[in-house]
Amino acid sequence: MKKALICIDYTNDFVASDGKLTCGEPGRMIEEAIVNLTKEFITNGDYVVLAVDSHDEGDQYHPETRLFPPHNIKGTEGKDLYGKLLPLYQKHEHEPNVYYMEKTRYSAFAGTDLELKLRERQIGELHLAGVCTDICVLHTAVDAYNKGFRIVVHKQAVASFNQEGHAWALSHFANSIGAQVAE
């Protein structure tokens, strides 16, 4: 079965210590795991999706405006990939198996062409990494489940600012949507 890695929201605003909506140290601690997974998938010729939250400054109609401070604003460094993932992406961005996509909702599937890209490549297994485990990773996983994809969540490559939410989401992945939670 063909597989893809979906790396979700691993950006400065979500991970850096001065990020606008940072998950803090837990997010920074998974950098090596995310970079290594990304390298592995690229080297093996598997599809790699970098799904990045993207917002317009001052968008009063977006539902997140009422929930969170402005973050991942188009044209800001906050929206850039975090740490060593950025130069890795820049090195491989023109390769056909590397896809950078913007998303405006929690799920990488909502309002995007992600499902089309995966189906065109006959991909049936999705490996998930990134932040936050209990928000965007969770919503992407549930949508993937509802679309019939096999799901693998890499426990060492997901994090959240909310440790209870993180633990709950890991349990939910395994027990409610049948995902493999890989150590």
UniProtKB/Swiss-Prot annotation:
<keyword id="KW-0378">Hydrolase</keyword>
<protein>
    <recommendedName>
        <fullName>Uncharacterized isochorismatase family protein PncA</fullName>
        <ecNumber>3.-.-.-</ecNumber>
    </recommendedName>
</protein>
<dbReference type="Pfam" id="PF00857">
    <property type="entry name" value="Isochorismatase"/>
</dbReference>
<dbReference type="InterPro" id="IPR036380">
    <property type="entry name" value="Isochorismatase-like_sf"/>
</dbReference>
<dbReference type="InterPro" id="IPR000868">
    <property type="entry name" value="Isochorismatase-like_dom"/>
</dbReference>
<dbReference type="GO" id="GO:0016787">
    <property type="term" value="F:hydrolase activity"/>
</dbReference>
<dbReference type="InterPro" id="IPR050272">
    <property type="entry name" value="Isochorismatase-like_hydrls"/>
</dbReference>
<comment type="similarity">
    <text>Belongs to the isochorismatase family.</text>
</comment>
